[in-house]
Amino acid sequence: MPVYRSKTTTSGRNMAGARALWRATGMKDEDFQKPIIAVANSFTQFVPGHVHLKDLGQLVAREIEKAGGVAKEFNTIAVDDGIAMGHDGMLYSLPSRDIIADSVEYMVNAHCADALVCISNCDKITPGMLMAAMRLNIPVIFVSGGPMEAGKTRLAEHKLDLVDAIVIGTDKNASDEQVEAYERSACPTCGSCSGMFTANSMNCLTEALGLSLPGNGSLLATHADREQLFLEAGRRIVEITKRYYEQDDASVLPRAIATFEAFENAMALDIAMGGSTNTILHLLAAAQEGGVPFTMTDIDRLSRKVPQLCKVAPNTQKYHMEDVHRAGGVVGILAELNRGGLLHNQVPTVHSKTLQEGLDQWDIISTGSDAVATFYRAGPAGIPTQVAFSQATRWPTLDADRVEGCIRSVEHAYSKEGGLAVLRGNIALDGCVVKTSGVDESIWVFEGPAYVVESQDQAVKDILDGKVKAGDVVVIRYEGPRGGPGMQEMLYPTSYLKSQGLGKACALLTDGRFSGGTSGLSIGHVSPEAAAGGAIGLVETGDIIHIDIPNRSINVKLSNQELAERRDAMAAKGNKAWKPIEARPRKVSASLKAYAMLATSADKGAVRDLSKLD
């Protein structure tokens, strides 16, 4: 029988000092016989997806205490990728994932907590906490802050999101009135950005991994129903904690729930819903933390057989996360995958013995439950607010149309090709990724001359200066985990290509990554990265690059001998090899240099290569 970890600090005469300190936090005699459950909150006033979380940690804590546990809340950092975008602030985004993972580990292990509730929401916070959960392998449950409502303005016929504001800001044909209207309307409420961007993609994937409750990824931050997710998380964590420590039930541990099969389920969901390419990076990292042998090869295999069943902004202007929820949420997509034989349905979850049991209870198509139908009719109020649970609007009906609705059946899929693909070739020997759901099918096969730049900043300048022409393949290199360092997101270059009318006329290739808000022929995560000796560092302006999504290939039209000669020439540069030709006006702090020293390329999840420490 496992011993409560907290007994290390709460039992025995020699722990009198530790107990004295615990008492100073408010613990009573009876509390030393209860499980101590850490509540990792990520409240910050910097991030709209987290601005409403301040009181929610204590909401969960009170419910934990009602259920017989002792709750201890702490905070992690949270970076807003949208605010950090387009300047050197983005260098810190991906490294913050590892800092979050480490900080959760430090707090939980330093204080010998028995279990963990992760209150996350945005881009690197959910992945960082997921990495920590897999690393710690103690009972855990995730509950996110929820998605933002989509924006509306009389100057647009469609609902708005952050990407619309970015694109129109550099559209020379847009009036100042339009730009201001979009800016004021694109992000109307608290919550993670309203499309299937990285934050919402990751919160959806925690459902597929079995580590969060139904609705976690899709129920709006503003809706009153979301309060119940937080309360249930508090009750549920006490239940599964006691099952582990008092009944020796290891099936409730993260590594028993988020198995290889669960990671395959999460990736199948990601492909089916056309999620952010960042999710690939984060799933690979989390799998490594848990010792799960899930790799790019598995992602490639799944991408060839899982169809696209859901299309959400930025891949369409028609649907946002509020529409996904109305159509049955993540469970709705998983249920369609299950009916198509594309799911491992016997894996456990934190809320049901098996995933199949959870689908039977929560799928709007098959359950017949009025309570479930009411839950998924939770909708937007259209009132700007930064307050959680502040409205109780409901759609008059569900979207149960699996032929032409937001979520479709396998038989009526948006496309037989899934929403994500892994490409390989002489320019990306270890692979690169593209969000096919955001690429017009007319350019799935594309060939053009390389336009090589060695920083995102230069790419942005050249695009806005009109130097990039239709037919070009913009190559942005030395922006990988090591080369950036920090693997910046390229939302601005892709958005500016759109604003210049080049969204369907150019491709963009990088060893950096893309925001979940990116669409277009944007190929990222090129591995190995340039700074690690990848062939992308050998490409020259004018080289012809051939991209073939259906055949999963990407190549620069150079012979092996030509590439070898260029590699020899690069090696001859000595300590200047595999670095930008010209020094970049970029301030790289000591902490970023430390990150770069250990960072692996994207195909490994951009995790730290700890073998370098041996």
UniProtKB/Swiss-Prot annotation:
Keywords noted in UniProt: 2Fe-2S, Amino-acid biosynthesis, Branched-chain amino acid biosynthesis, Iron, Iron-sulfur, Lyase, Magnesium, Metal-binding
A cellular-component GO term for this protein: cytosol
Binding site for [2Fe-2S] cluster: 122, 193
Record has Protein transport as a keyword: no
Cofactor annotation: [2Fe-2S] cluster; Mg(2+)
InterPro entries: Dihydro-acid_dehy_C (IPR042096), DihydroxyA_deHydtase (IPR004404), DiOHA_6PGluconate_deHydtase_CS (IPR020558), ILV_EDD_C (IPR056740), ILV_EDD_N (IPR000581), IlvD/EDD_N (IPR037237)
Catalytically driven reaction(s): (2R)-2,3-dihydroxy-3-methylbutanoate = 3-methyl-2-oxobutanoate + H2O; (2R,3R)-2,3-dihydroxy-3-methylpentanoate = (S)-3-methyl-2-oxopentanoate + H2O
Keyword Metal-binding assigned: yes
Active site: 515 (proton acceptor)
Pathways involved: Amino-acid biosynthesis; L-isoleucine biosynthesis; L-isoleucine from 2-oxobutanoate: step 3/4; Amino-acid biosynthesis; L-valine biosynthesis; L-valine from pyruvate: step 3/4
Source superkingdom: Bacteria
Oligomeric form and interacting partners: Homodimer.
Similarity annotation: Belongs to the IlvD/Edd family.
Xref: PANTHER family: D-XYLONATE DEHYDRATASE, D-XYLONATE DEHYDRATASE YAGF-RELATED
HAMAP family per UniProt: IlvD
Function: Functions in the biosynthesis of branched-chain amino acids. Catalyzes the dehydration of (2R,3R)-2,3-dihydroxy-3-methylpentanoate (2,3-dihydroxy-3-methylvalerate) into 2-oxo-3-methylpentanoate (2-oxo-3-methylvalerate) and of (2R)-2,3-dihydroxy-3-methylbutanoate (2,3-dihydroxyisovalerate) into 2-oxo-3-methylbutanoate (2-oxoisovalerate), the penultimate precursor to L-isoleucine and L-valine, respectively.
Protein's recorded name: Dihydroxy-acid dehydratase
Organism: Cellvibrio japonicus (strain Ueda107)
